[in-house]
Design a protein with these regions (language model features):
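Glycine/charged-rich beta-loop-alpha catalytic/anionic-binding loops adjacent to active sites
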Residues: 16-18, 75-79, 190-193, 212-220
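Residue-level signal for inorganic ion chemistry
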Residues: 35, 97, 133, 210, ...
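Short, glycine- and charge-enriched coil/turn segments that flank and shape catalytic ligand pockets
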Residues: 9-15, 55-59, 69-72, 119-120, ...
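N-terminal positively charged helical leader segments and presequences
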Residues: 1-69, 120
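Structured adenosyl-cofactor binding patch, chiefly the S-adenosyl-L-methionine
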Residues: 204-248
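RNA substrate-binding interface of SAM-dependent RNA methyltransferases
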Residues: 65, 71-167
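Active-site/ligand-binding-proximal alpha/beta "capping" segment
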Residues: 164-201, 205-206, 215-219
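A generic structural signal for short beta-strands and their flanking turns/coil linkers
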Residues: 2, 12-14, 34-36, 46-48, ...
Length: 248
């Protein structure tokens, strides 16, 4: 069934209103109209079955039939801090990790990042990245749209990275695996942050700075993973470990 994320202010009592791009997509792409049923989400985890009742020149109205009782969000909140790679790679990272269950994305510029963004370019990129995340969330059955933070420097990111379990996969770590780190956790962390380096990896200085802030370095295995693969592997392993992708 077709799914739409809308703002909570577009839900009034039992009436739902679709506007703009959602209206266009519903009518002109999906060819749906009065009598058809869709799924609407308010971005706060609430999901509704809605029947379309009326179409006007600028809005589509629907009636809430029932609130859906379904849990599609991981119990662990997972933040992916991704050193910015080239545009197409980052778009893939956003799409696939949204499908998987990541809750928040923090793009970051590191010493070996080969991406330069001025203010106007970043604004355009953020708009496109938001769109990719939203579409991936709709397609994959998410009940929230993951948060996308603005691009930050390494130092800015570390300053706000002081809660929960912080992990930094690093090719220089040969002793401690992700499994070993997780087995030492006394309880399920409410928040896990994973720091992923660029194509050339983190500098030693960055790893030291992260560990000084409490990050735990670890290895993801004997093979070196691409930047777009590393985050997906780490997120998959974490969500599986905590029971989101199957029984432990």
């Amino acid at each position: 069934m077709t799914r739409f994320f809308i703002s909570p202010d577009q839900i009034k009592d039992r009436t739902v209103i679709l506007r703009g791009g959602d209206r266009h997509h519903l009518l002109n792409v999906l060819r749906q109209g009065p009598g058809d049923e869709i799924t609407v989400l308010n971005g706060k985890g609430e999901e509704y079955l809605v029947r379309i009742t009326e179409v006007t020149t600028d809005q589509v109205y629907g009636e809430i039939i029932k609130k859906m009782e379904r849990q599609a969000e991981p119990r662990v909140k997972l933040t992916l801090v991704q050193s910015l790679p080239k545009a197409d790679k980052f778009e893939w990272i956003l799409q696939k990790n949204t499908e998987l269950g990541v809750s928040r994305f923090q793009p970051v510029l590191t010493e070996r990042s080969n991406v330069k963004l001025d203010k106007s370019t970043q604004e355009r990129k953020l708009e496109r990245w938001h769109k990719i995340i939203r579409e991936a969330a709709e397609q994959s059955g998410r009940q929230i749209v993951p948060v996308l933070e603005p691009v930050r420097s390494w130092s800015e990111m570390l300053a706000g990275c002081d809660t929960g379990l912080v992990l930094i996969p690093w090719e220089g770590e040969i002793v401690q695996s992700l499994k070993q780190v997780l087995e030492r956790q006394p309880k399920i962390p409410e928040l896990i942050t994973v720091l992923i380096g660029p194509e050339g990896g983190f500098s030693l200085k960055e790893v030291v700075e992260a560990k000084e802030k409490g990050a735990v370095s670890l290895t993801l295995g004997p093979r070196i993973l691409r930047t777009e693969t590393a985050g997906l592997v780490a997120a998959s392993a974490l969500l599986y470990h905590f029971g989101d992708l199957g029984e432990n």
